[in-house]
């Protein structure tokens, strides 16, 4: 272990065979915290960043993987973020001819686990504001007309990156900007067959529903977030005629595809309900839920669920939407109901969950 620092200068050796030997050895230990502690005082981060543009694909892969492993150490992750690496990672992720785009995306996902990494990606207040995130969304949705669009496992890491940036206020503001249409473009992916992608998209929706200042946009006909959220929890229950009155046509019995099923993933259903809870935080949100007549959907979901936590959360939403307007809860009551669903905001410690 003590000899590890001596290997770092060889990463910039002109001879590929020597460079690869050093990379292979450092790659083998970069997942070990003891090794990372020893390497902190070296130029390993700077040297590996220089190698991600190397002409040798094996060199690039090893360098990226080492950096990904180093991200497990908070100090080294913060150091990587400070190196202005985001533009290069975005280029590598969005280059459709790049066979290692997924590895670039993995590292970018790690970088955006920090608020500073997210701000670097967002370019808030700068000339390139939203440019990088829009490039990522363009790649994510570029195959939307293909038959396998809702089956493909490509670009899962891009979803995770967007999920990370919506953990902060600045990120939500850009993702929900009406002009760039990011939120609307990714919404259809709630129907994706891949559970990792569905979890990511629903996590993004949940984070965005947390921003009460954006509720008007979310519940507007332009977005119609309530219908989008109800589709994964609709199931194939046949609703009575009385239940269908006022319900969006997409949720009617006749509109459901044959064999339609409620999302089988507990985490997906949980995030749908958490999103609805956040939407009850504003009067317009509660009124919109009453107008949308989503009670039958929630009633059937409540009967479907077996876990107490999920049933309790569904019940919270139902309690709010069936009240008469003059009996609306006080802000204190809503805060009490929402306290378990509280997300980290820009002034809180920045954390994010894997999808």
Curated annotation (Swiss-Prot):
Pfam families: DUF383 (PF04063), DUF384 (PF04064). It comes from Dictyostelium discoideum (Social amoeba). Residues 324-355 are annotated as: Disordered. Belongs to the HGH1 family. This is Protein HGH1 homolog. Residues 325-335, 344-355 have a biased composition (Acidic residues). InterPro entries: ARM-like, ARM-type_fold, Hgh1, Protein_HGH1_C, Protein_HGH1_N.
